[in-house]
């Protein structure tokens, strides 16, 4: 049975881990890094993922970053005349993680646990699951990021404790409060903001730099796509540097030009200025912290440990704010970039039966219910209910002789239906005509362990039932998923062929070089016709390389290899004959010499002292 890998599919960076001999291990990417940028680029029909995609982002407008922010929406990105959904772009990232996990493990990988922000709604979870399927992965479980972090932190902890996980990633923010004890990880409350993260901290620096430059030169850099990408890179770098130093230099030469010539952006950004620019963002994270404490019925003094997750928690102002709010130093014993993937790998081990005595009790982040008369949102399942769960309620008709009932399924906290997120709609038909208030319609909500919702409506009079697994308006149909799976497989095949072709060209180049070296060495030592034959085969391979015809390169390379091999054998045979001849000559000389040898006689003389 194949291994279950744990994937942290992040807004800015992604990470993959696996359980080896009961120990979670982060798998490095081909560049040797333990996290991979969640960046996809398209260049002349070729797909670039990760480090290479991020490196060329400045010059390539067909580069997609932070696609996770659009999961569960009907957003599409158009690249080279083709429209891609967020699920497809995420699948390209997942495919890449899957491929280097397979290289590391030396076996195919088909199963995964993928993490999502705790505050992701049903549509976003469904989209993540679909992305996994498109990438050729069976998603065994969707697990919340803070819960995964708690799992990684608490697996070897003996004592009972209450922990608060503060997870500030590239594009999302979550807070979860969990109780740990005897292998049980129970989420008590979760809160968050799906549109707050490190990207927003970068943005305040970008806005500041744009404003400074505008005041100085009267040019708006935000209108220039390439300048904006350079600003984004510089802002991210400055933000990271300010976590360790109190000021940093931002230098962007030739960022723009006017009638007098090129213009450069040179400025110093202090940590104090950055903290002033981002103070409102830091304060925004405190709202969900207070909300989670309130929902769990706890005070800051009840929290034993604060676990920091996500690269953005390295910002000193963030750590200070947590310390002020909760009255304790955050725990620094986990790597904020890797802890979520490690937790996902542990959950994979739990599912596969490798990890024993661990029970994970997660919660639904948002209340679920239906629209009832007057546009009111009637909750069936309250937020922070432990999942999996099921809840039923009986409703009735609003008009006489009503034969159909529209079930409008919603997720959210607002009292009016229109203000909440629509998850789906379906109809229960063929209700026997009766006065209003007589028919009894039972609506049942089921939430599975992935946090995905299934709804049933049943007319208790006729026992007629209608059910749906929620597919959001942005959800993909089975046909679309199958088409995308096929395309992803074809692209993976095309990528594999491209890699093979590059390797073949490198091998052919190397062979041309070694052949030229060999021909110089064998000059005058082997038959001239043999050398000429090798020379011609080498020139034919060179010509094939220039034409870039892969099949021809392969044929010519094999032909040249064969000739060079024969040459080498002949050269070796010749060298062996020469060595033999020399040996024989040496042996004969030694024999002649022996005839003239005279045995000497000697007498031992002892010195008397």
Swiss-Prot record:
Positions bearing Phosphothreonine: 172
Presence of keyword RNA-binding: no
Superkingdom to which the source organism belongs: Bacteria
Segments of this protein annotated with the region Disordered: 578-609
MF term (GO), any: ATP-dependent protein folding chaperone
Compositionally biased intervals (Acidic residues): 597-609
CDD domains: ASKHA_NBD_HSP70_DnaK-like
Key words, A-Z: ATP-binding, Chaperone, Nucleotide-binding, Phosphoprotein, Stress response
Induction: By stress conditions e.g. heat shock.
Coiled-coil parts of chain: none
Keyword check for Transmembrane helix: no
NCBIfam families tied to this protein: PRK00290.1 (NF001413), prok_dnaK (TIGR02350)
Function: Acts as a chaperone.
Family membership noted in the UniProt record: Belongs to the heat shock protein 70 family.
Protein's UniProt name: Chaperone protein DnaK
Gene: dnaK
